[in-house]
């Protein structure tokens, strides 16, 4: 077997496989449990004392919410990889850029998640209450919870750019409905406006935009329900190591031929 064939073994990922991996990873995200069950139960708007008491009394539930966010961000990395493979045939460089935007969003969101970890530690370590006192401790908890939301909001700006580029790639593909591309691009622009709007236009009514975010679920549903119908013959090499192996082999042959060719100046002086 040639070195090029050896280098290419195990690297192929069909578009069908990439679609199913991305779709199931989307649907397995547990962040909705944290955002729509745990946080409304524990976080009381405008009452940091009650919020701190709730987190202290239900520490395990609060930690589960943190874990849900962490699992979701881990799945985001898998989705970035799968979507890159799925859309590389459309435009490999733009697909790579789109994946990088999702990875950067994941990193920003993960840094924000660390604020919740600090909140958990502050409220479940008795020494901190003795050291800071209740009032100062509650002030720190309030600051950390606000920082989590602000960091996550800035991450959503980057996520919006990712969705806009993703929609463009889908619109220009021949194996995913164009309407999904239009929808994702509009959602991406919507997230950017929603996150930056309070700073640019504080009075603008933008509260409806997060509800439109549920439209993003149409994409993973299509990937799971219809993605298996994408022709399996379409395959992507994620890393072009076959060409790299051929290039290295050619370079070795060139170097070998150079060493075997006598240099005229040296042979003449030897005579």
What is the role of each PLM region?
Residues 1-248:
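Hydrophobic, aromatic-enriched alpha-helical segments typical of multi-pass transmembrane helices
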Residues 248, 252-253, 258-259:
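Basic polycationic patches enriched in arginine
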Residues 257, 261-270:
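Short, intrinsically disordered C-terminal tails of secreted or membrane-associated proteins
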């Amino acid at each position: 077997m040639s070195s090029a064939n050896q280098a290419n073994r195990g690297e192929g990922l069909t578009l069908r496989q990439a679609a199913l991996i991305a779709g199931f990873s989307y649907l397995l995200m547990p962040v909705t449990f944290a955002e729509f069950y745990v946080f409304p139960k524990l976080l009381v708007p405008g009452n940091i004392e009650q919020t701190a008491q709730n987190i202290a009394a239900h520490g395990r539930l609060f930690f589960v919410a943190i874990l849900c966010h962490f699992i979701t961000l881990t799945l985001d990395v898998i989705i970035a990889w799968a979507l890159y493979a799925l859309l590389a045939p459309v435009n490999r460089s733009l697909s790579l850029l789109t994946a990088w935007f999702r990875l950067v969003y994941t990193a920003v969101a993960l840094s924000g998640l660390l604020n919740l970890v600090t909140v958990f530690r502050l409220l479940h370590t008795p020494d901190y209450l003795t050291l800071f006192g209740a009032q100062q401790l509650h002030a720190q908890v309030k600051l950390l919870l606000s920082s989590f939301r602000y960091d996550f909001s800035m991450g959503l700006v980057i996520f919006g750019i990712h969705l806009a580029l993703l929609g463009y790639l889908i619109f220009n593909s021949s194996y995913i409905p164009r309407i999904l591309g239009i929808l994702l691009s509009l959602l991406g622009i919507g997230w950017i406006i929603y996150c930056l709007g309070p700073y640019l236009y504080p009075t603008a009514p933008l509260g409806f935009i997060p509800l439109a975010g549920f439209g993003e679920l149409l994409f993973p549903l299509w990937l799971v329900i219809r993605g298996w119908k994408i022709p399996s013959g379409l395959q992507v090499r994620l890393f072009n190591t076959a060409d790299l192996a051929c290039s290295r082999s050619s370079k070795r042959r060139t170097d070998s031929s150079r060493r075997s060719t006598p240099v005229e100046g040296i042979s003449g002086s030897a005579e």
